[in-house]
């Protein structure tokens, strides 16, 4: 395997895929990225066996096709510290030989692990398919993920519950998260193709990785899922994840119905007031008391 690519192009792709690699791995191959050079380009893959990220890298000149693995964190840090305008050459003759990286007057060698040891996270059939705009996906995540539980014993709360339902006579795609103390719920119009989807719990790590990738995307994001796995396609990047195997609680039972105590406040002014008052709290939970009067709201 031998190819040449602009440092900026390679760095961007490495940043996307190496992010899923766990820093402390008991399985050595999971600390590596799979590099596959072939006619037409380069493909990078990283996985922790729960999530897999695959990216097709453009603008690569392939002199010799081949496959190898390389330590994700080391490769990323080397490329990150190269000059912005550098051309990066990666050369691996095959077998157990080391991977050579060259850029201008700099060169180094990296140990590799056998390609056959790199795990494949087979997707199986993903029968339910639909698309969301990048803005819709960002909103579903941003307005719910703060409520995801971090308590590992309640594993079924360690993600966002996504399902198709009805609200006010309209069909919607709803995202819900709760940690048992707070609950966040947000809806988008139901995309075409999502009507028959099962309710699924997308894990917290997947949500965080997906949100980072969605920040760079403006086009539609394709979603494909089964009751055990979900795949998001964001341009040249594919993120595939296992789903949490559990039953999300009947959250609607804890939402008050017919509540006539409704208050509307200016969002920015309220957020700024909460931040100022919470700043002087010494308690870990940083509580803020709301005193509500006629046409007034006092925070203390």
For each feature predicted by the language model, list its residue ranges.
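Structural preference for solvent-exposed beta-strand-turn elements
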Residues: 1-300
